Amino acid sequence: MDWMPPPKPTSPRSPPLLWDWADAAVPGSSSGEVSAAAAAAAAHPGRRRKEKRGRAEEGGGGGGEVRCQVEGCGVELVGVKDYHRKHRVCEAHSKFPRVVVAGQERRFCQQCSRFHALSEFDQKKRSCRRRLYDHNARRRKPQTDVFSYASARPPSSLLFDDNRQISFVWNKAPLSHVRPFAISPWESSSEVGTTDGHIYLDKSHISKSLPAFNTDIDELLPMKDFSAATIWMFFGVLFIRTAQESCMSFH
């Protein structure tokens, strides 16, 4: 009788890799309801957290009603504003200058919406010092209306207003820089000439009567067709105004 080796043991059949979710459904619920709930949870992962947070706030943090956290109060915050309910403080104690919270003296800050130590407040202020400083800094307006006099040639709007009347903005120079009229332009007719009905004065005579500006007369007057009478009228009024200010300074 011939010898034969024993047959090799066969490995058990491996289970299928795919899981049938329909077979593992919760008893009493269909597979469609389970798949719909799973899809909704995957699409909105933060909805369940918000629902839990809302239930915790309604129940006072996991049990009981929301009450004021000030020691000796314990008022149930029902039918009050959401602001006081959220920060767990009744309306009366939110305005108290001194309360006791967790065994320490505190004051409720209206800006921070939480309790601070009394040393962080100024006198009986209901907002802490840091928040008041930030609030006042925002209310300060920067001074942007400062005029700059650095331009060499001033615009014509400084010399004439909207009605084309002569302005007195050039009377801002110190009195020591303004020279009075040395000789009246109407005393000597030799320096005055007329052509086509316009009056022309000697330029050297004009330079003696003008204030000591660093700018030439052609740069001061933007309009070249001004008559000499208009120029003398302007500087005559300017001289009178300067004399009035000189008299006022002596009183």
UniProtKB/Swiss-Prot annotation:
Region annotated Disordered, chain positions: 1-64
Source taxon at top rank: Eukaryota
Record-listed Zn(2+) 1 binding positions: 68, 73, 90, 93
Keyword Ligase: no
Pfam families: SBP (PF03110)
Entry GO MF terms: DNA binding; zinc ion binding
Localisation per UniProt entry: Nucleus
Role summary: Trans-acting factor that binds specifically to the consensus nucleotide sequence 5'-TNCGTACAA-3'. May be involved in panicle development.
Protein name in UniProt: Squamosa promoter-binding-like protein 4
